[in-house]
């Protein structure tokens, strides 16, 4: 069995919100509420100290074996204002900036597939880190 979850960890907020993005304030928030709440909490955090990361954790369990965990991390920064590239259900896409690519996560997902494949995100990185283990399971079954 394979399961995964993803969270956003903001350095200046001690790793908040983690996997509780949607219920960060204790109730189910809209995308706009999440963006506003994040930017309000970060309003006094100076540039250069606005680091954050998306973290995906894959959990793999087979039969009675212990659970194996695999991380994928995508580092970036939280902008002071959201950019227009938005997608319903992805509140951090317009404010999560990827300095090495000079674009937000929302802009990244608008790029051609070849570009996206060449620049794996947290989800792809988690899967890539699990591949050797998955291959070993396949070999053991053969």
Where are these regions (language model features)?
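Anionic-ligand binding patches
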Residues: 1-142
